[in-house]
Amino acid sequence: MTVDLLLGLQWGDEGKGKIVDVLTSKYDIIARFQGGPNAGHTLEFDGIKHVLRTIPSGIFHKTAINIIGNGVVIDPVVFQKELEGLEKFNMDVKSKLLISRKAHLILPTHRLLDAASEASKGKAKIGSTLKGIGPTYMDKTGRNGIRVGDIELADFKERYRTLADKHEAMIAFYDVDMQYNLQEMEAEFFEAVEVLKSLQFIDSEEYLNNAMKAGKSILAEGAQGSLLDIDFGTYPFVTSSNTTAAGACTGLGIAPNKVKDVFGIFKAYTTRVGSGPFPTELFDGDGQTMARVGNEFGAVTGRPRRCGWLDLVALKYAVQVNGVTQLFMMKGDVLSGFDTLKVCTGYKYKGEVVSHLPYNIEEENVTPIFIEKKGWQADLTGMTKYDELPVELKEYIEFIEKEVEVPIKVVSVGPDRTQTILK
């Protein structure tokens, strides 16, 4: 068997959690391959909203095995709270959740380092979630990190102390005013590590490749979005991992030729949390309407999301770097009520009109070129079939398909798993 990938194509918050939840019944294994608790996957069903930070979105299905791959970074404290939240629903998490020994751990001092680094930047802040993600990946690439498998070693606490002491020296270097009680943070951390030890650790690359040989179906779940990729995103306003399709291979230990379908998720408009360029951002009533109707607040941070029109230049770029084979369009219902919609089809850049994503898309460098499409007024939230959708929405969908040259197979018309239309 092969692996299918599910990726966000914008700046995150596209609705991956819901779609994974919808697709899970088709797969034996759901595997998360990068990121950490800075990303929240929101699922809504039976009138209850669930936000997962590290645990894969397939955990709510009875038969699916869920894997946290080597490319993920885990904060034991956040992870423990996530487990406790799931226990309220009488879920047997431990039998369905497997964790790669090669996944790296987020230490309390990683979070402190993150906060100190961001505070020292002043107006040049990149909008970090302050979850310790960046410093953890820095230690990983710097070959200083502590991995899940190290928990099982006799000298784990000594390894921890060596790295934490190094972090404290770095925090002092930033010379920012920070109040914290590291002793309390460490006590909480080591308590959470004991909880983590009660779960099953695996060599995920071995497990997944054996599963494929045994004919198991696998869905690899990405966090955040392609435009936040450390290499291909809007650097430096990006995350610290590879959020694109290639990240699934390195974050799980699967070969590129094992990837079959790449499902790309995007919103019918565009959003972004935190700092960074956003060419189609709206600062008027239309943007406020999108934010209000779409409930655009970060699942983890609670920060309001910036809203704007659909950017086809950025979307085509994301489709290209990921090799997307099918598109899933989310939140079509949010655009109901707009008389006219705008879509960015190009940029004015250095005196020329370009249809590709330039190296630098800061606002002073690019001006979006818009075309207008007719909006629709119908309430989509109760619709269940593609034929029921208003003609204007179908024309909007067909226009996007023509521009990006990839079919849209799913249209989401509401937050619940049942509000999903297959085309």
Residue ranges and their predicted role:
Residues 1-423:
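Non-transmembrane, aqueous-exposed alpha-helical and coiled segments at domain scale
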